[in-house]
């Protein structure tokens, strides 16, 4: 990074301190090659980027091999449609760690990542029921993503947390079942069942997390959240309930 190229207004006195450039050292670096494709899906323009290389910090390094999808124009549903087409092939999984997150972790000495038991659900003070539903599923997805990363990196104890996160999804769907009918999540629940069976029978973490069953189940949960897929199944009475106070719903 050439600090002299930064605009003068970023510096306290309007100019680069004389000795700053010599004192600043990078925490980590990324060195990767990017290939890009422009894809049209249902009238939307999507960029697919394939990055291959490594992220390094001191003596530590780990490989980069990832696909990124960016919607350039059009509908978000087109990105999800393309993602579904991609994960129907084995060898892909929905990751959660950015290059920067991995770089900072390496810069801290690459410590072992710890198991994180599921925390108490926290929502905004005036959240409605729908926001509570979303928060619960987002918590489950975050737990799934985090512990899947640990599991595939060699922490076998994280497998149980992955299964616990999937169970939390099921429990959430059941808890809100008085408002959101089961038929709204039939496809999602079917994919979760296939995913659980794959995880239970897999000979290794890599086999499980890079399977189409796991990838499609996790993406289905993401899509269910992003598109609010429960809404078309709500009648007028359910619409009223889901817009009501989450605190009142939880107290009951």
Label for each model-derived stretch:
Residues 1-252:
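Function-determining surface determinants
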């Amino acid at each position: 990074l050439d600090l002299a190229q930064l605009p003068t207004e970023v510096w306290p006195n309007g100019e680069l301190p004389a000795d700053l450039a010599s004192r600043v050292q990078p925490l980590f670096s990324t060195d990767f090659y990017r290939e890009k494709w422009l894809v049209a899906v249902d009238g939307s323009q999507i960029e697919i980027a394939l990055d291959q290389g490594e992220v390094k910090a001191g003596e530590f390094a780990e490989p980069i091999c990832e696909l990124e999808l960016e919607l350039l124009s059009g509908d978000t549903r087109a990105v999800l449609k393309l993602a579904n087409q991609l994960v129907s092939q084995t060898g892909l999984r929905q990751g959660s760690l950015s290059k920067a997150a991995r770089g900072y972790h390496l810069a801290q000495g690459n410590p072992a990542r710890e198991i994180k038991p599921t925390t108490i659900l926290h929502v905004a003070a005036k959240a409605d029921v729908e926001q509570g539903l979303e928060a619960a599923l987002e918590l489950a997805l975050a737990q799934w993503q985090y512990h899947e990363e640990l599991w595939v990196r060699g922490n076998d104890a994280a497998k149980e947390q992955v299964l616990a996160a999937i169970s939390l999804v099921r429990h959430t769907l059941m808890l809100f079942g008085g408002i959101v009918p089961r038929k709204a999540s039939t496809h999602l629940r079917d994919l979760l069942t296939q995913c659980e069976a794959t995880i239970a029978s897999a000979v290794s973490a890599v086999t499980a997390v890079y399977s189409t069953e796991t990838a499609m189940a996790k993406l289905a949960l993401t899509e269910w959240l992003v598109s609010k897929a429960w809404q078309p199944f709500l009648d007028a009475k359910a619409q009223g309930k889901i817009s009501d106070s989450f605190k009142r719903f939880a107290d009951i």
